[in-house]
Amino acid sequence: MANNNNKDKCNVPNLRFPEFSGEWEMSSIGEQFELYSGNTPSRMNKNQFDGSINWITSGELKEHYISDTKEKISEEAAKNNSLKLLPVGTFVIAIYGLEANGVRGTCSITTRESTISQACMAFTSKMDIQNEFLYSWYKKHGNIIGIKYAQGTKQQNLSYDIIERFNISYPCMEEQKKLIRFISLIDQRIATQNKIIEDLKKLKSAIIEKLY
C-alpha cells in the first residue's frame, strides 16, 4: 500500500493500493442495507428457550465472528415471535446499553444461521458493500457513533431512524475485496503471534514448576 498524495480528491483514503484511483462512493446505511432488529421470546413459556437456534444478545458481540450463543431458542419461539433466521455472514451490532464501554461499538459477523434480540441490529447488504468491509468501518467509527448519537436517560440506545441516516464511504467491489483480504492476513498473523505467546507462557509456567 502507498500514501495517497492526491489532495485534489476529498473522498479518498490516506493509504491505498496503488492500482486503485478515483474517489470512493458515498451512500447512507439505509440505502445500502436492509436493517432488522429482533425481540425476546416470552420466558413464561420455557419451551421457547429449549431449542437449537442461536439467539444473539448485545453482550455477545465481542469477537469478529459469532458461532454460538449462551441461550438458544426453538423453532416455535422463532415462529411465534416473527424472528428472522439470519443467514451466515450477517453483520450485527449492539444498539442497547451503549452507555457501557464494553457494549458501545461492538459488532460481529455470524458464522451460523441465527436470530437476534431487540438489543441488536442486523445489516443485510443490498448491493454495493460487503459485510466484512462494513465490519472494519464500524470497528473504526462505532464507538464514536454510540457516544454522539445514542439516546436515552438511564440506557443509551441507537434506533433504526438514526442508523439508517449514517453515511458510509466505500470503494468498488474489487478494492473492497483486496482490503478485506489484506486485513484478514493481518488478523491471521495476530492470531499466530497470540498462540505463540500463550505457548511460551505455558512453557514458562512448566519450567518454573520444575525449578522451584
Residues covered by each model-derived region:
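Short amphipathic coiled-coil heptad-repeat segments
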Residues: 1-22, 192-212
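DNA target-recognition patches
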Residues: 30-33, 43-76
